């Protein structure tokens, strides 16, 4: 009987771990340069995270650091999880460009260019972030969430990055975190009503990676974001950074 009880408890613990509800807040487009300063929305979200005793992740566009703003860089350092803050900063490319080539084909920073070009952007961004902040990216998310097979090959040149958000389907070398529900109905516009509708319909029970552009949010969008976060907290969702989540699933 005792053995049966122990086995039952073990099964319950395994089930609990498998069904644990985890949310990752993926915020895009941090800039911290003299030409393109840090948007106030990132500071507001970090302050919210501190008040809520939780964490968020923010992607840095690194060409802005070619001419860094001292105050913005100091803010990154002070708020980084490595320094006791609430923000995981991740690699969001060098220049976040998209364009149409001479043949009329759409190109993105990490979809279209060859391996060498993409590798240079990855390495340059990694190097300048380390140089200006003393921190190292462990997580990558491509601009526009556009990446290709060349990106997969180029990523081998930045071995410090072990986690990829929204990768191509063929990616197998790094831990991957895929897209789930949406909190924005358009870039920079959060809708609690739309999210709540989708959330109720799909009834997610495992990890959710939720993308936003908080640097563009107005007061209404921020309030709707806070309502979404409150809803998930009430429903038992735990907030982690991408690295914390990868570590957690790696132990199972």
Identify the function of each model-found stretch.
Residues 22, 69, 75, 139-142, ...:
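Active-site-adjacent pocket scaffolds in enzyme catalytic domains
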Residues 28-30, 61-63, 94-96, 145, ...:
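Active-site beta-loop-alpha junctions enriched in small/polar residues
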Residues 55-149, 206-210:
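Metal-dependent polysaccharide deacetylase catalytic core of the NodB/CE4 family, i.e.
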Residues 162-166, 214-252:
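C-terminal domain-boundary segment and adjacent tail
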Residues 41-57:
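Catalytic domains of carbohydrate-active enzymes, especially glycoside hydrolases
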Residues 18-44:
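Boundary/entry segment of secreted carbohydrate-active catalytic domains
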Residues 42-46, 73-77, 119-126, 152, ...:
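Generic structural signal for well-ordered alpha-helices
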Residues 3-12:
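Sec-dependent N-terminal signal peptides
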